[in-house]
Amino acid sequence: MARCADRNDDMTLHRYVPPFSLPPHGDALAADSWHVIAGRGAATLQLPAHWPSLWLPMRGRLSMQAQDAHWTLFGGEGQLWRAGALNVQASHESRWLALVAAPTVWNVAFANSADDEEPLPWRGDPGDGVHEAMEALAHDDDALALLIPALIDRQRDVAACLPRCRGRTLAHRRQALLRLLNLRHLMQCHVEADDDASIDVPWLASRAHYSPGHLIRLHRAVFGETPSDYFTRLRQARAWELVRETDMPVATITHRLGFESQSAFCRAFKHAFGMTATQARREADACAA
C-alpha cells in the first residue's frame, strides 16, 4: 500500500494510490481523518458501515453492493453514499477517485462551511465543481476547501426536501429524509437491475421501520408522490430505454420489468407514452438512420 499523510490546521488527510490494499471493512482506517483514494485498475474495497463516502469513476465502472441492492456507476457519474456498509469492485480498465471518512469528520467539515448542513446522499452527475475539486484533492490538500462547498451546492435539491419531513428536531427530520432517500435508491437499483422479483410498499416500509401507511403519507408529503408512483415512473423510464436503445424482444422486457404479461406491458407502455412499443422502436430506428 502506498500511502502518504498530510496535515493542515484542521484535519489529517491520508492518500492511497495503487498498488494499495485497504484493511478489511476499513477497521484500521483512522476515524479522525479523511481518506482519499486514487484508484486505477481492478480493485475491491469494503468500507465501514455508517461511513459516508464520495465516489467518482473517471473511466470504466464501479460495481457497488450494499444491503438489499447492487448497482453500477459508470465514468462521468458520481455518488455520495451514506446508507450502511458498502462493497465496491472496480473494473480493470477503470480510473476512479473516492473520499471516505467517519461521520464526525464529514459533519464538522459541512457545519464549518454552512450552518446546519450535513452530507446528504445523491447519485448522478456530480457537477463541474465536485469533479474539479476531487481531481485536485488527489494531490492538493487545499482542494478540500473547494470540495465541501461544491458538495453542499450539489445536494441543494435534496436538502430542499428536508423542511417537508416530519420530526420534532432537525436531527429527526434529517433521519426521516435519509430513510426515504435510501428507499428511493433501492427502487432505482431494483429497476436498473431488471429484477422481476416483487418489491412493494410493505417490503419498503419494513426496511425503513415504518408502517406501510405512514411510509405512503410521508413519501407523498416530502416528494409529492407515493412510493408506488415513483416506482412506476422509474419502470416506465426503464421500459422506454430498453425499447428504444436495445433490440431486446418485448417479451423479454416484459419479464425483466416484472409485468404480469406482455399485453399488460404493452397497455402500460401505450398509456405512458402515447404509442406502442413497436412504434417507439421504429421511431428510434428511423432517427438512428
Language model regions located:
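Proline-centered helix-kink/hinge sites
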Residues: 227, 276-277
